[in-house]
């Protein structure tokens, strides 16, 4: 029964080329037969059989349909195209904006009424030329590109040249083709459940399980 429930083949990854570098059986899943009774052996067989069924189902879900397990060149349509990292550039300072927003912020921070309030009536009058929070906002030409502006007043501007950044998202003009990345490799090369590995002739054994198999020449190095 142990031959009917094979140990799966674990794929190795070659990061330089983006291809599989052979596969070998994971013998760490084998049990210690010297301390196992018939009942334990039966339970282990059941667990191994369930594991193989899970791996087969996972492969059907995550693998990209293809005729060759590891093609020499993966076309762009079969590859996960990773987004390019964003590029950050420094924006020039806008001294006019800083002065205008600082002046407005000084009024928002507080102030004294120009005229005494009428007796018994509290009038929420704001003095100065500051903006009202419930009314208009500063002109779009006064707002910094990075969205930073000052609400609290002061004699010194709180803006710093290091705060003015613009982030640009780059995009590749040509889709990538060739080998798979590490993220896609885990999805495409699920541990292989090779049923009855010793029941057929040697030439039926998958060549891509062999580490020194050359996918370009479709041959095994050192063998005719």
Curated annotation (Swiss-Prot):
Propeptide: 112-154
InterPro entries linked to this entry: Adeno_PVIII
GO annotation, cellular component aspect: host cell nucleus; viral capsid
Post-translational note: Cleaved by the viral protease during virion maturation. May cause the middle segment to be shed from the capsid.
Keyword line: Capsid protein, Host nucleus, Late protein, Phosphoprotein, Virion
Zinc-finger found in the keyword field: no
Superkingdom field: Viruses
Phosphothreonine modification, residue list: 64
UniProt entry tagged with the keyword Ion transport: no
Site (Cleavage): 111-112, 154-155
Induction summary: Expressed in the late phase of the viral replicative cycle.
One Gene Ontology MF term: hexon binding
Miscellaneous comment as given in the Swiss-Prot or TrEMBL entry: All late proteins expressed from the major late promoter are produced by alternative splicing and alternative polyadenylation of the same gene giving rise to non-overlapping ORFs. A leader sequence is present in the N-terminus of all these mRNAs and is recognized by the viral shutoff protein to provide expression although conventional translation via ribosome scanning from the cap has been shut off in the host cell.
Subunit structure: Interacts with the peripentonal hexons as well as the hexons in the facets. Part of a complex composed of the core-capsid bridging protein, the endosome lysis protein VI and the hexon-linking protein VIII; these interactions bridge the virus core to the capsid.
Family, per entry: Belongs to the adenoviridae hexon-linking protein family.
HAMAP family per record: ADV_CAP8 (MF_04049)
Protein name, as recorded: Pre-hexon-linking protein VIII
Classification lineage: Viruses, Varidnaviria, Bamfordvirae, Preplasmiviricota, Tectiliviricetes
Gene expressing this chain: L4
């Amino acid at each position: 029964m142990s031959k009917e429930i094979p140990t799966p083949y674990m794929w190795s990854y070659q990061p330089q080329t983006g291809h599989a570098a052979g596969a070998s059986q994971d013998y760490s899943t084998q049990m210690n037969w010297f301390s196992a009774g018939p009942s334990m052996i039966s339970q282990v067989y059941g667990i191994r059989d369930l594991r193989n069924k899970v791996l087969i189902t996972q492969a059907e879900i995550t693998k990209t349909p293809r005729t060759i397990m590891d093609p020499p060149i993966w076309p762009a349509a079969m590859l996960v195209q990773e987004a390019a990292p964003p590029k950050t550039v420094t924006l020039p300072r806008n001294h006019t904006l800083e002065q205008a927003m600082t002046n407005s912020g000084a009024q928002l921070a507080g102030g004294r009424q120009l005229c005494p309030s009428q007796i018994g009536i509290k009038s929420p009058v704001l003095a100065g030329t500051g903006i009202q929070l419930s009314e208009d906002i500063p002109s779009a030409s006064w707002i910094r590109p990075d969205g930073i502006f000052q609400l609290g007043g002061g004699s010194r501007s709180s803006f710093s040249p290091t705060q003015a950044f613009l982030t640009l998202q780059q995009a590749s003009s040509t889709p990538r083709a060739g080998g798979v990345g590490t993220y896609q490799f885990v999805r495409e090369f699920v541990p292989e459940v090779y049923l009855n590995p010793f029941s057929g002739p040697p030439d039926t054994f998958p060549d891509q399980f062999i580490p020194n198999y050359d996918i370009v020449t479709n041959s095994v190095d050192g063998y005719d």
